[in-house]
Amino acid sequence: MGRRVEVTISIDDLHPEKGWGCEGDESVEYLQKPNDEFGCKFTLFVPSFYHKKYPLSEHKEWVDFWLDKDWVELASHGYYHMCEDSDRFGECEFFEINSVDKAEKTVELCLEEWDKVGHKPVGWRNPGWLINPLIKDSVDDKFDYVALHTEHNRGLNWSSKMLFGHDGINETDSINIWNDNTFMFQSHIAGDWNDNCWTKENYLNFRNVIEYLLSEYDISFKTLKEL
């Protein structure tokens, strides 16, 4: 048996829209399979009012569908996951916000949606990875950990536990050990502009990666909050 390591798998942008993490979706099947076969666990980063169309407060059954799975953690991924000036900021919601008051109000609204469905997320990932440094503290004191990108974090120091790592489920030859002893896989549930979605091709690739890691290491699968 090889070195003892941990493996985490995070997935961004799930919300209660068909094709984006709903019961019966093909992508959801590709999450269930590695849990059944290997015991994989997943941290799902969820915007609480995606694109102003899918408030969690109106979709409690969707939240409960995921919370009923003991191998899933639901974490926060912003409020709207969209910007007023999308040409300039894309969907980097908290990079566009440039005032503390607006940031605090947005975080408050974000967490209210979660509260209405009876769940308090302990983890956070910035939509689009980026955040305006001026408003970092508005987010920082609300969560136990933040999931970060080494480049896009741009040297910011958070008081919350900082978890780095973003290797894609579609990758095979550029996988790293992060945070001393953890393989940190990052992906998206859908979106044809992303190359790390849970398609059949990526699922099969990732299954091969997990089989290889299991042959080389003593693996413990974890959600991010379990690190």
Language-model regions: role of each:
Residues 1-71, 218:
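Active-site beta->alpha N-cap acidic-glycine motif
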Residues 11-12, 76, 148, 185-187:
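Active-site flanking residues adjacent to catalytic metal/cofactor-binding acidic residues
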Residues 19-21, 54-57, 133-138, 195-197:
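A short acidic (Asp/Glu
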